[in-house]
UniProtKB/Swiss-Prot annotation:
<keyword id="KW-0934">Plastid</keyword>
<keyword id="KW-0689">Ribosomal protein</keyword>
<dbReference type="InterPro" id="IPR001705">
    <property type="entry name" value="Ribosomal_bL33"/>
</dbReference>
<dbReference type="GO" id="GO:0003735">
    <property type="term" value="F:structural constituent of ribosome"/>
</dbReference>
<comment type="similarity">
    <text>Belongs to the bacterial ribosomal protein bL33 family.</text>
</comment>
<dbReference type="InterPro" id="IPR018264">
    <property type="entry name" value="Ribosomal_bL33_CS"/>
</dbReference>
<dbReference type="InterPro" id="IPR038584">
    <property type="entry name" value="Ribosomal_bL33_sf"/>
</dbReference>
<dbReference type="Pfam" id="PF00471">
    <property type="entry name" value="Ribosomal_L33"/>
</dbReference>
<dbReference type="GO" id="GO:0009507">
    <property type="term" value="C:chloroplast"/>
</dbReference>
<dbReference type="GO" id="GO:0005840">
    <property type="term" value="C:ribosome"/>
</dbReference>
<dbReference type="GO" id="GO:1990904">
    <property type="term" value="C:ribonucleoprotein complex"/>
</dbReference>
<keyword id="KW-0687">Ribonucleoprotein</keyword>
<protein>
    <recommendedName>
        <fullName>Large ribosomal subunit protein bL33c</fullName>
    </recommendedName>
</protein>
<dbReference type="InterPro" id="IPR011332">
    <property type="entry name" value="Ribosomal_zn-bd"/>
</dbReference>
<dbReference type="GO" id="GO:0006412">
    <property type="term" value="P:translation"/>
</dbReference>
<keyword id="KW-0150">Chloroplast</keyword>
Length: 65
């Protein structure tokens, strides 16, 4: 019997510092696409990723689609 594919979903991660302040060299918001397992991580995912607009590693938070 095959397992259900509904557990693993695609999510979008957005930079928290880019969306809050406008004092950057370039305008834009850094976004990453990833997958998460709903059973293991029911809450919103937060990862530290590189932001090309801030030129630093910043916290990227899961957003609603």
């Amino acid at each position: 019997m095959a397992k259900s594919k509904d557990i693993r979903i695609a999510i979008t991660l957005e930079c928290t510092s880019c969306s809050e302040n406008d004092e950057k060299r370039f305008s834009g918001v850094s976004r990453y696409v990833s997958e998460k397992n709903r059973r293991n991580t029911p809450t919103r995912l937060e990862l530290k990723k590189f932001c090309p607009y801030c030129y630093k590693h910043k916290i990227h938070r899961e957003i609603k689609k």
